[in-house]
């Protein structure tokens, strides 16, 4: 993050199974934690939703396809996706259409939990540095940061600036490169 130079900020790396958070100031981590909700958990929750609502058991790959095609954090999104699976009530294959609006509630609930963890992290920042973080942005990275609407959702919930680089899924690798 070029925007991060000599500033403070909260880094939220939404990986596949874990989200890592760090409050960083002047190249030092002053507080951090890991939260066991990542992109794969979002996908699993979509699969669970489809099973509960439609009685359709879909594979993780089908749920991931749905997440990538139409899921997002825009409540008025009118897109939709089609998934196929096993109807557990009929014992037969079936294909259904799921709207982005349906999935929004599932994703919003998970992202609200993530925002709560960021808020908790901000409360653990040492008092003498807390003012820096109130004026600093949240940096979202990792593959999960690419979820449609994630940046705006965080901005609306956290009332803080939010930055997501176009290559956010490579942020951890690029960061590791700097220390090697």
Regions inferred by a protein language model and the residue ranges of each:
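Extended, folded domain segments that form the structural surfaces/walls around functional sites
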Residues: 1, 5, 13, 147-153, ...
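Conserved phosphate-binding catalytic cores of ATP/NTP-utilizing and phosphoryl-transfer enzymes
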Residues: 1-12, 174-180
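A short acidic Gly-Thr/Ser loop motif
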Residues: 4, 11-18, 24-28, 38-40, ...
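Phosphate-binding glycine-rich/basic clefts of nucleotide- and phosphate-handling proteins
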Residues: 25-115, 123, 133
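Conserved helix-loop functional segments at active or binding sites
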Residues: 120-128
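Conserved phosphate-binding/catalytic loops in two-lobed NTP-binding clefts
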Residues: 154-177
């Amino acid at each position: 993050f070029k925007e991060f130079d000599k500033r403070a900020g909260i880094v939220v790396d939404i990986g596949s199974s874990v989200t890592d958070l760090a409050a960083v100031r002047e190249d030092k981590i002053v507080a951090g934690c890991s939260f066991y909700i990542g992109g794969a958990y979002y996908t699993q929750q979509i699969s669970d939703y489809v099973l509960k609502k439609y009685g359709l058991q879909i594979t993780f790959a089908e749920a991931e396809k749905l997440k990538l095609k139409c899921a997002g954090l825009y409540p008025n999104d009118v897109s939709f996706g089609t998934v196929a699976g096993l109807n557990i009530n009929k014992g037969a294959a079936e294909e259904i259409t799921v709207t982005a609006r349906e999935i929004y509630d599932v994703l919003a609930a998970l992202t609200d939990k993530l925002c709560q963890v960021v808020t908790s992290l901000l409360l653990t920042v040492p008092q003498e540095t807390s003012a820096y973080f109130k004026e600093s942005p949240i940096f979202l990275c990792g593959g999960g940061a690419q979820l449609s609407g994630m940046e705006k959702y965080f901005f609306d919930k956290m009332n803080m600036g939010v930055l997501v680089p176009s290559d956010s899924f490579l942020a951890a690798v690029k960061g590791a490169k700097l220390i090697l």
